[in-house]
Amino acid sequence: MADVPGAQRPVPGGGPEPRDPLDCWACAVLVTAQNLLVAAFNLLLLALVLGTILLPAVTMLGFGFLCHSQFLRSQAPPCTAHLRDPGFTALLVTGFLLLVPLLVLALASYRRLCLRLRLADCLVPYSRALYRRRRNPQPRPARSSPGPQVAPTSGKVWV
């Protein structure tokens, strides 16, 4: 038999067979595009969750830094009408104290959302672009007796 470059040859052992070079390249581009879309959705979800949960702390820090006389000396009406420097210092301290617990809460909720949406399952490994899976039919086990089948017990008894 002649050895043709790029021809599909069966791999001994029934494992995955390599794809043609052009097919491999096209699949690699598609796998990369899908993985980039999943990563972009992950970043968008992370920004949405962090932005929503960290909003109170960021607002306090923003007003504290914008209105305190040691930083920007802003003469905007919200800065001069409501608080003085001790109030803006309290805003800064409270904002920094709230930042870490809210960050932990935001990351925990992001993780829970990722697990619930199963976003990690959407990532495709590059081995799928390089190898084609063989579809071998799984043989069904033959029934030994025509009677009802008893499920194996695990040793636990529920009373």
Curated annotation (Swiss-Prot):
Subcellular location: Cell membrane
GO cellular component: plasma membrane
Stretches for region Disordered: 135-159
UniProt topology in membrane: Multi-pass membrane protein
Transmembrane regions listed in the UniProt entry: 43-63, 88-108
Any one GO BP annotation for this protein: negative regulation of canonical Wnt signaling pathway
UniProt keyword terms in alphabetical order: Cell membrane, Developmental protein, Membrane, Transmembrane, Transmembrane helix, Wnt signaling pathway
Main location: membrane
Family that this chain belongs to: Belongs to the TMEM88 family.
Role noted for this protein: Inhibits the Wnt/beta-catenin signaling pathway. Crucial for heart development and acts downstream of GATA factors in the pre-cardiac mesoderm to specify lineage commitment of cardiomyocyte development.
Binding partners and assembly: Interacts (via C-terminus) with DVL1.
Listed name of the protein: Transmembrane protein 88
